[in-house]
């Protein structure tokens, strides 16, 4: 599993715990390796290429906070990272507030204040992010899944003919947690499985959260609903 060293938050850790707890229940013998990726890591491209060659991987964190996410997703879609002119290679993209915007091939600044995830084809918002100090708010995430063909020479005992790459990108931290809940849900398992190897699948998660009254410094939000939208 890949995380950003500088910007790993408590939300990323909650998403990590959600995923590892589920996988341990599915297979108690499963082994995990956690990898941090600092910003401007020089061998980043080489690490991305290795990731697609061996093993099953989960990458956590949006391009706002995890540079590795941008690199992995763009490698899957065979486009240059950090290139806004590549937006139309994707079905969906982030629409960020101006203070949060970063250079990304699948994200751009909002022009009217509505932030979240948009359909690239229509430009319409399909999942919204609203921040509240108390009450009900909204967040969202992108989940990208790719099945990667594994050549016979790299298979264990002639089995395991493919690797799975999963990238969970929340608009904010609670969106990443919501994405983790959707990723482990039996309800959405079929919809998150690509039809064939070599073709990445991108899906949108829409989530609501509750924030009870409390000290303004306490981030006491809890996910109340997380669902996978139909394309």
Predicted regions mapped to residue ranges:
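Solvent-exposed alpha-helical segments and adjacent loops
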Residues: 1-231
């Amino acid at each position: 599993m890949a995380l950003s060293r500088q910007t790993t938050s408590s939300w990323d850790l909650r998403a990590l715990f959600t995923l590892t707890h589920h996988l341990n229940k599915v297979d108690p013998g499963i082994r995990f390796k956690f990898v941090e990726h600092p910003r401007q890591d020089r061998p980043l491209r080489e690490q991305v290429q290795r990731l697609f060659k061996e093993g099953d991987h989960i990458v956590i964190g949006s391009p706002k906070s995890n540079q590795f996410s941008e690199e992995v997703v763009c490698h899957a879609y065979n486009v240059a990272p950090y290139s806004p002119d590549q937006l139309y290679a994707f079905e969906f993209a982030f629409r960020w507030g101006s203070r949060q915007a970063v250079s990304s091939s699948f994200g751009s600044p909002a022009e009217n204040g509505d932030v979240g995830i948009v359909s690239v084809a229509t430009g319409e918002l399909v999942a919204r992010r609203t921040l509240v100090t108390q009450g009900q708010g909204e967040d969202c995430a992108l989940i990208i899944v790719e099945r990667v063909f594994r050549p016979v020479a790299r298979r264990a005992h002639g089995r395991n003919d493919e690797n799975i790459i999963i990238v969970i990108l929340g608009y904010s931290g609670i969106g990443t947690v919501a994405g983790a809940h959707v990723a482990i849900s039996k309800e959405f398992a079929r919809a998150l499985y690509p039809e064939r190897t070599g073709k990445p699948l991108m899906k949108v998660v829409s989530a609501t959260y509750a924030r009870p009254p409390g000290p303004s410094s306490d981030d006491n939000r809890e996910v109340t609903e997380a669902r996978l939208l139909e394309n």
